């Protein structure tokens, strides 16, 4: 099994560990009711929740307020020129909590992550929460264990999902380790260490493609369900090959009395077993694992709840 660097989700000094990654199978009693059931022009419906898409990138773009004051803040981060798909209001909030910069938001194949559906690995992020959400994605280049620290690193993607049904498709090249988190309803802060204080998704593409949900930064973070589909073309009306969510193939703090964790021995991987799930132990004795089934190309559907 290939070594894979998970972005440890707490203090900087705890983010130096490498681990071997693994995968999960959905519980037979788990019913995921988010299948796309209708197609009409640029609008899909997920159980009657519309997913608005543009014809160019199959992603929703929100312009937001356009005033000069909305594009400025007291932060060093500039909102004067907005990346594709990021609203001025969302950029302004990101600046107010101390983020280093807005995302690059490439709309072409840049060899890493970009907005669009033409890559070997695609991620569809769906707002199912009913409140404005800002998607934040990062690339862990050269095993950079600080890549998720948004106070010192520029993310690859920051994208506005302003209402229920808002969706965007992101492509990733093979061989890409990275992750995502989300800002909910203009209320999610950065942690004291500079990470988004919410639930994380972590992934690596390529030969040992794996994805997991991590709750280590904030055990009380917002809920997310991640469904893994096999090689493209993908039919999301079929059952996924694997599911990771808040209770399945998820990293959680071992102690129920803490709100966050990250030290060796302080967390565990729960409910990650089955033919499409893998669990392991790294050299420090920490659990490793997550959802596989999308080697060198596949589709990941992420629903924010």
Question: PLM features: residue spans?
Answer:
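Asparagine-centered strand-capping/turn motif at beta-strand->loop junctions
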Residues: 122-133
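Extracellular low-complexity, O-glycosylation-prone Ser/Thr/Pro/Gly-rich "stalks"
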Residues: 3-8, 22-120, 149, 185-305
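Sec-dependent N-terminal signal peptides
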Residues: 9-14
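Intrinsically disordered, low-complexity Pro/Gly/Ser/Thr-rich segments with frequent PxxP/GP/PP motifs
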Residues: 148-182
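C-terminal segment of classical bacterial N-terminal signal peptides
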Residues: 17-21
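Surface-exposed binding patches on compact interaction domains or structured appendages
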Residues: 143-147
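Folded extracytoplasmic luminal domains of secretory or organellar precursors
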Residues: 138-142, 185
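Intrinsic-disorder/low-complexity, polar/charged segments enriched in Ser/Thr/Lys/Arg/Asp/Glu/Gln
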Residues: 120-122, 167
């Amino acid at each position: 099994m290939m070594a894979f660097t998970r972005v440890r989700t707490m203090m900087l000094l705890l983010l130096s560990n490498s681990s071997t990654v693994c995968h999960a199978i959905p519980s037979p009693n788990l019913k995921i009711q988010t299948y796309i059931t209708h197609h009409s022009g640029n609008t899909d419906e997920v159980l009657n929740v519309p997913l608005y898409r543009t014809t160019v990138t199959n992603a929703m773009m929100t312009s937001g307020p356009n005033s000069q004051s909305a594009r400025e803040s007291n932060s060093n981060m500039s909102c004067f020129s907005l990346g594709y798909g990021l609203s001025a209001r969302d950029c302004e909030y990101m600046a107010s909590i101390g983020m280093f910069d807005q995302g690059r938001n490439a709309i072409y194949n840049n060899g890493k992550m970009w907005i669009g559906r033409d890559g070997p690995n695609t991620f569809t992020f769906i707002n199912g929460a009913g409140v404005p959400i800002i998607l934040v994605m990062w690339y862990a280049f050269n095993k950079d264990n600080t890549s998720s620290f948004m106070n010192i690193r520029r993310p690859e993607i920051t994208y506005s999902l302003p209402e229920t049904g808002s969706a965007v498709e992101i492509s990733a090249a093979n061989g890409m380790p990275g992750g995502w988190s989300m800002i909910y309803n203009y209320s999610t802060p950065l942690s004291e260490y500079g990470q988004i204080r919410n639930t994380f998704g972590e992934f690596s593409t390529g030969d040992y493609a794996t994805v997991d949900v991590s709750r280590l930064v904030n055990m009380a973070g917002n809920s997310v369900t991640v469904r893994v589909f096999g090689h493209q073309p993908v039919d999301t009306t079929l059952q996924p090959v694997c599911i990771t969510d808040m209770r399945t193939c998820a990293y959680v703090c071992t102690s129920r009395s803490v709100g966050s964790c990250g030290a060796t021995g302080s967390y565990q991987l729960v409910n990650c077993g089955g033919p499409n799930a893998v669990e392991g132990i790294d050299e420090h004795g920490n659990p490793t694992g997550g959802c596989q089934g999308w080697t060198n190309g596949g589709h990941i559907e992420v629903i924010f709840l």
